Each structure stands twice: as structure tokens, then as C-alpha cells.
């Protein structure tokens, strides 16, 4: 092989390796930032396709805050509450200031890490906008696997916290 061909081959290989490394790093970064959405029932029982999150996995979970389940630590901003759809309850632990629209009986979406089978340590809690709004992920998941929730007048008005 003459020197000119060797040089071209080296350049082509370097470009190929560079592009491959870039694509690999992009896919790795995308996979690390992907948070799958679950309802409390799907978190406990698994999704219909059999997937179930592992302890330590980042995820998003959406559902309704159970009435009377909000527990606040008087010495810190730590709050824990139960979340449900129409099945099992999941405990959410959050340290920070909750959104103004957060209240018992309202829908929320929490983003966090699964600590054990029924506990999520959230680093972000989002409250729904009004009593008629339901996040698209929750509405779609509930249409597929659950009966729609019927709100009482008390739930629609809020708990008055």
C-alpha cells in the first residue's frame, strides 16, 4: 500500500471512530435522562407488557393524593404522602416546597427515584392546574387500565390547607 492510500485510510478510520464514539455517547446520555411514566398500579404490579421498574431507577409517577395521607416533618421541608389511582397506594417522599396547587384529593405528577417497591423519593412534584385538568399521561394510562375516578364535591373544592 502506498503512503497516500495509507494516509487516506487513516483519515477515514479516524472519522469513522469519531462518529461512532459521538453516536455512542449521545445514546448513553439519552438513556440516562429517560424517565418512564408509571401509575401507582403499574409501579406495584408492572405494566401490561411486563416491564416493572427496578429499585434505583428514575421515573415519573402520576395519580391522586390520598385524603389524610400528607405527613410533614415539623423541623424540615420533608413531606411524604400517598398516591393512588384505583389500585394500590405508593408513598412519595419529597424534600422541598410543594406547589401552591398541591392538596389532598388532587392529581400530581412526581419525578424521582424508586427507593423500594412502593416508595418513590421525588426531586420534583408538579400539581395539576384545576379540578378538571388531568395530565395526558395519567388520562391515557387510566383509559387503558382503569375506570375514571369520580371526584366528590369535597375533592373538587380541595381540603382547604
From Swiss-Prot:
Q: Which gene name does the record give?
A: ccmE
Kindly list the places in or outside the cell where this protein is found, as annotated in its UniProt entry: Cell inner membrane
Show the InterPro entries listed in the entry: CcmE, CcmE-like_sf, NA-bd_OB-fold
Q: Pfam families per the record?
A: CcmE
Return the protein name.
Cytochrome c-type biogenesis protein CcmE
Q: Which family does it belong to?
A: Belongs to the CcmE/CycJ family.
Keywords associated with the record: Cell inner membrane, Cell membrane, Cytochrome c-type biogenesis, Heme, Iron, Membrane, Metal-binding, Signal-anchor, Transmembrane, Transmembrane helix
Question: Which superkingdom, per the lineage?
Answer: Bacteria
Give the species this sequence originates from: Vibrio campbellii (strain ATCC BAA-1116)
Query: What would be an example GO MF term here?
Result: heme binding
Its biological purpose: Heme chaperone required for the biogenesis of c-type cytochromes. Transiently binds heme delivered by CcmC and transfers the heme to apo-cytochromes in a process facilitated by CcmF and CcmH.
CC annotations in GO: plasma membrane
Whether rRNA-binding counts among this entry's keywords is no
Gene3D superfamilies, per the entry: Nucleic acid-binding proteins
Q: Which residues lie on this side of the membrane: Cytoplasmic?
A: 1-8
Annotated residues that bind heme are located at 129, 133
Which segments cross the bilayer? 9-29
Q: How does it sit in the membrane?
A: Single-pass type II membrane protein
Asked if Repeat is a keyword of the record, the answer is no
Ranges facing Periplasmic side: 30-161
A biological process (GO) of this protein is:
cytochrome complex assembly
Amino acid at each position: 500500500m502506498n503512503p497516500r492510500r495509507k494516509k487516506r485510510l487513516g483519515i477515514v478510520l479516524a472519522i469513522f471512530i469519531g462518529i461512532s464514539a459521538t453516536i455512542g455517547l449521545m445514546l448513553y446520555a439519552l438513556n440516562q435522562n429517560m424517565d418512564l411514566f408509571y401509575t401507582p398500579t403499574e409501579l406495584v404490579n408492572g405494566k401490561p407488557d411486563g416491564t416493572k421498574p427496578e429499585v434505583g431507577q428514575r421515573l415519573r409517577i402520576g395519580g391522586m393524593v390520598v385524603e389524610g395521607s400528607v405527613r410533614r416533618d415539623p423541623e424540615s421541608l420533608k413531606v411524604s404522602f400517598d398516591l393512588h389511582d384505583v389500585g394500590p397506594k405508593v408513598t412519595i417522599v419529597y424534600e422541598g416546597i410543594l406547589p401552591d396547587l398541591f392538596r389532598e384529593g388532587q392529581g400530581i405528577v412526581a419525578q424521582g427515584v424508586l427507593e423500594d417497591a412502593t416508595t418513590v423519593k421525588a426531586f420534583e412534584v408538579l400539581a395539576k392546574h384545576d379540578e378538571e385538568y388531568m395530565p395526558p399521561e395519567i388520562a391515557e394510562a387510566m383509559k387503558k387500565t382503569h375506570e375514571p375516578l369520580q371526584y366528590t364535591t369535597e375533592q373538587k373544592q380541595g381540603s382547604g390547607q
